[in-house]
């Protein structure tokens, strides 16, 4: 409040003396001063950033996101990128005459869909992100769960659901669950100044590829790396109590809230794996997880380095000690 008051007095008293550009420079300086304690707190810490396909709606937005991530590296933070690619996979499937199907926010993945997913995630999106990191002045390196057997998993069992009162099994195909994250290769990459870019393709004991939701992978990797934060970027402003009302934004969610909100139908569709990924991370030592709108310019910097924040924060509620 005192900063705001001083700024108002300054503007009123000196607005005729100084140019608008000079005032703007002073405001920028205030932004840097506000960011300083956060930069000090986060220095040398690991942050896992999941960049969703829905956040990559344009080349300019993607460039802004990567610039922000490269900036984090330059101020001493160690970012790890996990990328999705759902819209791109769906688009590619459509061009190949195949319909995308989902169950509880997870893509049903038969053999053909698995091949398409690998083609899009590893051969297209991953290489584009690594290239863009280089253009923005950083050093990126592309990885999958195969590399160093980093992400080991198993195929999910068929799901039992009630359809018209009849219990039915739904086989979601090569959709996997993480068993083990081997972070050794990530530590090596980070210590050498690189930004790892991870496609969410895991491997099972027989060498089969598994499609694992990128939000879940990001949560598991954040936990394995003992990351300071997990950031999940999407195309909405965090969690909304009413999907049709942008003013129903929920700014904070505890682990205890998540199951209740899923049961109430507040958390549904693609937001379910996001909150589950956040919950896994926070349960396993990550201080906080943040769901933010990646299509808002520099939203990640606003969430990390300002007092206000703009997304939904997931944290572990600790009861006060008596």
From Swiss-Prot:
UniProt GO MF annotations: acetylglutamate kinase activity; ATP binding
Gene3D superfamilies per UniProt: Acetylglutamate kinase-like
InterPro entries from the UniProt entry: AceGlu_kinase-like_sf, AcgluKinase_fam, ArgB, Asp/Glu/Uridylate_kinase, NAGK-C
Broad class of where this protein is predominantly found: cytoplasm
Keywords from the UniProt entry: Amino-acid biosynthesis, Arginine biosynthesis, ATP-binding, Cytoplasm, Kinase, Nucleotide-binding, Transferase
Cellular component per GO, a single term: cytoplasm
Pathway(s) served: Amino-acid biosynthesis; L-arginine biosynthesis; N(2)-acetyl-L-ornithine from L-glutamate: step 2/4
Any Pfam family matching the protein: AA_kinase
Catalysed reactions listed for this entry: N-acetyl-L-glutamate + ATP = N-acetyl-L-glutamyl 5-phosphate + ADP
This enzyme's EC code(s): 2.7.2.8
Statement: the UniProt record of this protein carries the keyword Cytoplasm: yes
Binding-site list for substrate: 85-86, 107, 211
Protein family according to the UniProt entry: Belongs to the acetylglutamate kinase family. ArgB subfamily.
Its biological purpose: Catalyzes the ATP-dependent phosphorylation of N-acetyl-L-glutamate.
Protein name according to UniProt: Acetylglutamate kinase
Gene: argB
């Amino acid at each position: 409040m005192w900063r705001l008051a001083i700024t108002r007095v300054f503007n009123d008293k000196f607005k005729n003396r100084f140019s608008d550009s000079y005032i703007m420079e002073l405001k920028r300086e205030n932004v840097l001063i506000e960011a300083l304690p956060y930069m000090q707190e986060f220095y040398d810490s690991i942050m896992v950033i999941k960049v969703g396909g829905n956040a990559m709606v344009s080349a300019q937005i993607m460039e802004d996101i990567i610039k922000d991530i490269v900036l984090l590296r330059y101020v001493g933070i160690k970012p790890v990128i996990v990328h999705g690619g759902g819209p791109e996979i769906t688009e590619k499937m459509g061009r190949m005459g195949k319909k995308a199907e989902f169950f509880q926010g997870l893509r049903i993945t038969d053999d053909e869909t698995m091949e398409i997913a690998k083609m899009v995630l590893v051969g297209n999106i991953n290489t584009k992100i690594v290239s863009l990191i280089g253009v923005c002045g950083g050093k990126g390196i592309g990885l999958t769960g195969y590399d160093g057997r980093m992400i080991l998993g198993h195929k999910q069992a068929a799901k039992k659901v009630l359809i018209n009162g009849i219990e039915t099994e739904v086989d979601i195909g090569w959709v996997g669950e993480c068993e083990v994250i081997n972070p050794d290769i990530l530590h090596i990459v980070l210590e050498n100044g690189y930004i790892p870019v991870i496609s969410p393709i895991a491997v099972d004991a027989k060498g089969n590829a598994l499609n694992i939701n990128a939000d879940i992978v990001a949560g598991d990797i954040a936990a394995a790396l003992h990351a300071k934060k997990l950031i999940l970027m999407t195309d909405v402003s965090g969690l909304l109590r009413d999907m049709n009302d942008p003013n129903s934004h929920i700014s904070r969610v505890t682990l205890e809230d998540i199951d209740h909100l899923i049961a109430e139908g507040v958390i549904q569709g693609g937001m379910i794996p996001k909150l589950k990924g956040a919950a896994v991370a926070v349960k396993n030592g990550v201080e906080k997880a943040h769901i933010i709108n990646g299509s808002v310019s520099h939203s990640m910097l606003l969430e990390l380095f300002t007092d206000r924040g703009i997304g939904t924060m997931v944290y572990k509620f600790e009861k006060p000690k008596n």
